[in-house]
Design a protein with these regions (language model features):
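Glycine-rich phosphate-binding loops of nucleotide-dependent enzymes
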Residues: 2-239
Length: 239
């Protein structure tokens, strides 16, 4: 459960530009320890840019702090702090096995038992145990996404950034990933999720932000979002 008053991530008045395009406009958000926060919004709203900026891959103007200190702008240092980004697109090593792809995520750990760490991932995604020796390129899209999430978890994140993890996946795979994310969050990992699939984004979140054309236009609980007429009409198909 979220720890009240214990903010892991604080972003204040963040502005990001691509050339002359103002992509993120005075974005302010907060994520508490143990919280599951979802950011919803249409394609092109700025969700990926926000995650790239948090991860140090894109420059921004504003304040980003992690556990009360300014977040460094060096991506390697950000990872060492425990902020792990699982980007859209999976980015696996196609000619490496599932096992070796997963182990690539443990590079920041000093002393660890590979088999013990892998077992945690296989408990979340049992199909990966069966696929352990297969090349990543032979996997289905859903299995590749499970490997990508598992690889991020191998770094023992304190804050896990997940960018569009269900894009193009079948409903049964989305359900498996949703269940895994709940277990991950229940184990104490703070999650910040960017997702176009709004029912998925609302399923296990504690709080939700709506980002449209680079602006945070709404913040609230999943229940408040489901009851909002604009959200219902635009993002939930009138449900």
């Amino acid at each position: 459960l979220p720890v009240e008053g214990s903010e892991v991530l604080v972003i204040e008045n963040l502005n990001v530009y691509y050339a002359k395009a103002h992509v993120l406009k005075n974005v302010t958000l907060r994520v508490s320890q143990g919280e599951f926060v979802s950011i919803i919004g249409p394609n092109g709203a700025g969700k990926t840019t926000l995650f790239r900026t948090i991860s140090g891959l894109k420059d921004g103007h504003g304040r980003i702090s992690f556990n009360g200190s300014p977040l460094p702008r060096d991506p390697a240092k950000i990872v060492q702090l425990g902020v792990i980004h699982c980007p859209e697109g999976r980015h696996l090593f196609p000619e490496m096995s599932v096992r070796d792809n997963l182990l690539m995520g443990a590079f920041r750990l000093k002393d660890f038992d590979p088999d013990a760490e892998l077992e945690k991932i296989y408990q979340l995604f049992p199909i990966l145990r069966e696929r352990e020796r297969q090349m990543a390129r032979t996997l289905s899209g859903g299995e590749q996404q499970m490997v990508a999430i598992g690889r991020a978890l191998m770094g023992r994140p304190e804050l896990l950034l997940l960018d569009e993890p269900t894009l193009g996946l079948a409903p049964i795979v989305r359900k498996a990933i949703a269940d895994a994310l709940k277990q991950i969050n229940d184990s104490g990992v703070t999650i910040l999720l960017a997702e176009q699939n709004v029912p998925f984004a609302l399923a296990h979140a504690h709080r939700v932000y709506l980002l449209e054309t680079g602006v945070i236009v709404k913040e609230g609980t999943p229940e408040e979002f489901r009851a909002d007429a604009h959200v219902q009409h635009v993002y939930l198909g009138g449900v």
